[in-house]
């Protein structure tokens, strides 16, 4: 397994172990408390360390000449910046795929993203480039494209608790999604091993409906916290100005190019729904978006607020 250190990776690893699979995780060697906690919590798994960008490391430190039936990858670039995306989402995966094809591995399960159905960003093109290689590889493949994650929609909880406004782009209903929990997604990914109906398929997947807009997310938080609703509407045009400015400055200052791409990513998520895109109408359609699991975003909000569950939002905590 690749990418076991992230929250989706951990959930998938737990699901694999729960189903009785013997799992070897190949990951970067880190000494952070988070990684130590993962190793402590998941002692039924074997951890091996090395670099996913080094073919020799993947072979000698990862596979070690052993036979494997399936590769499961929840690996993804951390920031979405162009270099990171092509290094991890494409190059690292490509190196692993080339190796496993020579080792008798029969099946490859890939965690991708639903947003690649309408590619406008470098990380989306990188993901699609590897998806194409995987589809053409001859292996049994399952490409899982989830909608939104719970923690991606939880970055404003502390802001609202402090009495600040909930930020929305435009009118707050430009987008909607059917978010899926880590645990439900992990189970869905793990089930792809045995479920032949998911073999040789691209699998968009969301959590239970109905689809939720940013305004509905904010309204629920205010109700939950017993606070009067207070929204601040951010014009999408502001993001356009930021992108144009960073794009122009990036020609002179290379370090700003990644920031420009990150601004483009922000605009994409502010204006594009994380639902299946109807290819005939070019409209995002919640009815076409498959659902899996029972966990709801609003129940997750309750746990975070009333049970004081600590979740590392990392890059998701954009609005503070």
Regions found by a protein language model. Give the residues of each.
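N-terminal Rossmann NAD(P)H-binding glycine-rich loop of SDR-like oxidoreductase domains
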Residues: 1-21
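Substrate-positioning beta->alpha
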Residues: 92, 172-193, 201, 213
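A hydrophobic C-terminal alpha-helical subdomain
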Residues: 237-320
């Amino acid at each position: 397994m690749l990418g076991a250190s992230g929250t989706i990776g951990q959930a998938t690893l737990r699901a694999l172990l729960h189903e009785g699979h013997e799992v070897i995780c190949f990951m970067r060697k880190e000494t952070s408390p988070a990684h130590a906690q993962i190793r402590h919590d998941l002692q039924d798994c074997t951890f091996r360390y090395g670099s996913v960008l080094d073919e020799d490391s993947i072979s000698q430190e990862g596979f070690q000449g052993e036979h494997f039936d399936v590769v499961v990858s929840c690996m993804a670039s951390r920031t979405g910046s162009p270099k990171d995306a092509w290094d991890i989402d494409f190059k690292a995966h490509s190196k692993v795929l080339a190796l496993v094809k020579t080792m008798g591995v029969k099946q490859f399960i890939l965690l991708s993203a639903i947003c690649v159905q309408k590619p406008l960003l470098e990380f989306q093109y990188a993901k699609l480039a590897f998806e194409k290689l995987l589809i053409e590889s001859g292996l049994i493949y399952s490409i899982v494209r989830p909608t939104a994650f719970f923690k991606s929609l939880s970055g404003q909880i502390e802001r609202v608790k402090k009495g600040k406004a909930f930020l929305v782009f435009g009118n707050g209903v430009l987008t909607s999604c059917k978010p899926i929990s880590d645990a439900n997604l992990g189970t869905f990914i793990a089930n792809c091993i045995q479920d032949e109906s998911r073999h040789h398929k691209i699998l968009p997947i969301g959590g239970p409906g109905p689809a939720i807009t940013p305004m509905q997310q904010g309204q629920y938080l205010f109700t939950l916290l017993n606070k009067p609703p207070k929204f601040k509407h951010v014009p999408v045009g502001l993001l356009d100005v930021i992108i144009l400015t960073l794009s122009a400055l990036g020609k002179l200052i290379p370090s700003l190019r990644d920031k420009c791409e990150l601004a483009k990513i922000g605009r994409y998520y502010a204006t594009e729904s994380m639902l299946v895109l109807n290819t005939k109408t070019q409209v995002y359609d919640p009815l076409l978006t498959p659902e899996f699991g029972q966990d709801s975003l609003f129940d997750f909000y309750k746990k975070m607020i009333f049970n004081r569950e600590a979740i590392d939002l990392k890059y998701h905590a954009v609005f503070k």
